[in-house]
């Protein structure tokens, strides 16, 4: 088996674990059956989940057997957040989200061979459990004073919101998952984020009590952070989702393309499957020519392909180039163009209007007089064609797919106009 621990550490994917020597030996002797859980608290995974999803993939490629758990039971409860109670979703809603998340996780894993992945749902062993059975068989083995010390619980107890018994009990449900997976599949390792460490160790404690001969482990990845202090995975428009209907492939690609130079080396190591030599070369290029954004482009292309497929990546790259004058906008299919333009400032008008009016209305300039100056200075473009006259009005035949105009001021300032009455 591949000794994966050093690789995980080099990539910045190793925050903490139970006895590291024992874990290292188990992974070296392998294969280890391990699990990672994903709660369906929304209809899609977001980019923050990629750390876990891709680490599961990485461990499977090293020869280990993954159990990907989508929490049809725990998703109805919700892991305690630092600030407030979660909104409870109906069982029907959660069940629908379980299927959506399964569909997003499955393409990252292999379901063939000796270490074939298995998708599991903790509702299978929780739904038929009575309250009496749960309290006698699971709750009996936990001590409240220890449960109160878990970070997720302690933070809530210090807040004015407090914590409900429902969310307080979440760690018991997650602990039961580890017990069930050990008994059903021989699972001996649990993987999660470092913010889940209290829940991971709760599972270990339960196994040690009920299966004292079991040799089991827990391993946590660090949380993704940003150099500017803002939350990873968020934009002005909200979370960056893996579902293409919630975040377009174009917006997904642009999210990675716009990663801060201070963060890109860290993100590349954590998320990319490129070799050390390739990553070190990209780090060197970033240091020497940060304006080229070679590492950002490489990561954006790799992750967009993993999540959305090579075809979507090619379309997104073509759209990105065309928007900035390095390709033909007219050659983009309507769906790709519309997705790209949806991420830009845009206005809707009934008929084509003078270019200076459109530039001012969409906010590319502060006023019509500023728009005229931009035209005079040669910095105004419509569909990548330079505007040469202050009184220019786009013709209907100029509209992309019969309804779109792409406005650009200078090299980087873009906006879109949709003509509704064309």
UniProtKB/Swiss-Prot annotation:
Query: Binding positions for L-tyrosine?
Result: 35, 170, 174
- EC identifiers of the protein: 6.1.1.1
Q: Which residues form the S4 RNA-binding domain?
A: 353-419
Q: Name one molecular function that GO assigns to this entry.
A: tyrosine-tRNA ligase activity
Sequence motif 'KMSKS' region, location on chain? 231-235
Binding sites annotated in the UniProt record for ATP: 234
> What biological-process terms (Gene Ontology) are attached?
tRNA aminoacylation; tyrosyl-tRNA aminoacylation
Reactions listed under catalytic activity: tRNA(Tyr) + L-tyrosine + ATP = L-tyrosyl-tRNA(Tyr) + AMP + diphosphate + H(+)
Source organism, top-level taxon = Bacteria
Q: Which GO terms describe its cellular component?
A: cytosol
PANTHER family (UniProt xref): TYROSINE--TRNA LIGASE, MITOCHONDRIAL (PTHR11766:SF0), TYROSYL-TRNA SYNTHETASE (PTHR11766)
How it assembles, according to the record, is:
Homodimer.
Function text: Catalyzes the attachment of tyrosine to tRNA(Tyr) in a two-step reaction: tyrosine is first activated by ATP to form Tyr-AMP and then transferred to the acceptor end of tRNA(Tyr).
Report the NCBIfam families cross-referenced here.
tyrS
What name does the UniProt record give this protein?
Tyrosine--tRNA ligase
- Gene transcribed to yield this protein: tyrS
């Amino acid at each position: 088996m591949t000794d994966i621990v050093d690789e995980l550490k080099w990539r910045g994917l190793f925050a903490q674990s139970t006895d590291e020597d024992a874990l290292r030996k188990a992974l070296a002797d392998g294969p280890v059956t391990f699990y990672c859980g994903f709660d369906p608290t929304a209809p899609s995974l977001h980019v923050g989940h990629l750390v876990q999803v891709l680490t599961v993939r990485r461990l499977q490629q090293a020869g280990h057997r993954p159990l990907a758990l989508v929490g049809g039971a725990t998703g109805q409860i919700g892991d305690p957040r630092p600030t407030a109670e979660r909104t409870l979703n109906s069982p029907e809603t959660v069940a629908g989200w379980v299927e959506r998340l399964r569909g997003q996780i499955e393409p990252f894993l292999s379901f063939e061979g000796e270490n074939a992945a298995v998708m599991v749902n903790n509702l299978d062993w929780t739904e038929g459990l009575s309250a009496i059975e749960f309290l006698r068989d699971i709750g009996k083995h936990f001590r409240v004073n220890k449960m109160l010390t878990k970070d997720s619980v302690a933070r809530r107890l210090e807040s004015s919101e407090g914590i409900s018994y429902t969310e307080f009990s979440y760690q018991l449900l997650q602990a039961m998952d580890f017990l069930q997976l050990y008994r059903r599949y021989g699972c001996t390792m649990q993987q999660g984020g470092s913010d889940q460490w209290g829940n991971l160790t709760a599972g270990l404690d339960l196994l040690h009590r009920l299966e004292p001969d079991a040799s089991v482990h827990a391993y946590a990845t660090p949380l993704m952070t940003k150099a500017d202090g803002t939350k990873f995975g968020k934009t002005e428009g909200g979370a960056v989702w893996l579902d293409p209907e919630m975040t377009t492939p174009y917006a997904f690609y642009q999210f990675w393309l716009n990663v801060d130079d201070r963060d890109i080396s860290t993100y590349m190591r954590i998320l990319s499957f490129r070799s050390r030599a390739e990553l070190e070369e990209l780090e060197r290029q970033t240091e020497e020519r940060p304006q080229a954004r070679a590492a950002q482009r490489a990561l954006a292309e790799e992750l967009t392909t993993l999540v959305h497929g090579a075809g979507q990546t090619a379309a997104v790259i073509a759209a990105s180039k065309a928007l900035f004058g390095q390709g033909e906008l007219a050659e983009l299919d309507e769906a790709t163009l519309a997705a790209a333009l949806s991420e830009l400032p845009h206005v809707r008008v009934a008929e084509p209007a003078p270019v200076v009016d459109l530039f001012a209305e969409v906010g590319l300039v502060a006023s019509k007089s500023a728009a005229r100056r931009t035209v005079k200075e040669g910095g105004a473009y419509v569909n990548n064609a330079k505007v040469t006259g202050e009184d220019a009005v786009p013709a209907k035949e100029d509209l992309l797919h019969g309804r779109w105009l792409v406005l650009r001021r200078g090299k980087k300032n873009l906006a879109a106009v949709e003509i509704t009455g064309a």
